[in-house]
Amino acid sequence: GFIDGHTHMDAQVFWDQLGSCSCYHGVTTTVMGNCGFTLAPCRESEADLVFRNLERAEDISRGAMLEGINWQWETYPEYMDAVDKVPKGINYAGYIGHSALRTYVMGERAFAQNPTDDDMRAMKNAVREAIHAGAIGFSTSRSPSHMTSDNRIVASRVAPDEEVCEIVRAMGETGAGIFQLAMKRGETDAMLDFYQSLADLSKETGRPVTFGSLSRKERPGQWKLFYDLIEKENLRGARIFTQVHSREINSLLSFETSTPFDHWDVWCDFRKLPLGVQISKLRSDAVLRRKLIGIADQPYSGPEAYGAEPRPPDWDSFYVMDQIPRPHRSVGE
């Protein structure tokens, strides 16, 4: 079967024996714990510190996690033991996550401060312990898209680059483990420097590095420069593996889940109504329909979207999924 190299099944594994929806696509092994978002290491009394990462970045509700998880761990090896005990239809591998690691060691300081020497020793020891117990590696996030549900940047993004490098070096001492990260964004020259630093770290530690790679509309040719650097550095001994999609990434939006307009004037009150009432009003209230459409046609001026939250509408990138064959009509058309 296929290996799904980037999932966030860390909580779902406790209530979903099948491993959906990965299992529906021929996947027999999933890799969880990406982007630094794991449920361990963490004390049960501090579970909200790790829940908040998954709530906003990955759209997993706190209520589902509270109901579906029987918390039986503190350290990452104990978390692995808990996963091992539940029935599973597919195989799982997991990273130890930087945001969870940071809040476990530093508490609330993780959101505002650099680590002390004692903090660094504790984090490096925890990573070594996790790798020896079977963790597939260490993950972090440098992505500006990753925020907590209480509107703070995730703890790993507070960490200076040298902290990340020190932890990867500690993992390298074990002779095992992959370094996974959610990539930062920036101007081309700055990003080329960052890619070079990853290549240098891989060569220094002997650890492979992996991350998702996207082509962005605002910088359509940037990815080729990055890939040229990666190819060159891999020939020199680095081990960098990008994860790419063979098609565009898409999100399915609906009134049953969320829409890009849920925070807009009039829409926000309308969307608080029960779904059946919304449907009824759309059918019967012509004045309300005109208001909703008029507001949706205006330039967006609401809060910035993060993680799995719906983005403001870009009609040329919204497609009407009314048929199976491509191409699909854009809403702009």
Segments predicted by a language model, with ranges:
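Di-metal (Zn2+ and/or Mg2+/Mn2+) metal-binding site signature of metallo-dependent hydrolases
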Residues: 1-21
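Active-site neighborhood of phospho(di)ester-bond hydrolases with catalytic His/Asp-centered motifs
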Residues: 2-6, 32-34, 182, 212
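Acidic, glycine-rich active-site loops and adjacent beta-strand->loop/helix elements
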Residues: 8-11, 35-38, 185, 215-217
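Short, function-defining helix-loop hinge/capping sites that tune catalysis or transport
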Residues: 12-16, 34, 142, 251
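Divalent-metal coordination cores built from histidine and acidic residues
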Residues: 15-137
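Active-site neighborhoods of metal-dependent hydrolases
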Residues: 79-83, 89-91, 95-108, 113-117, ...
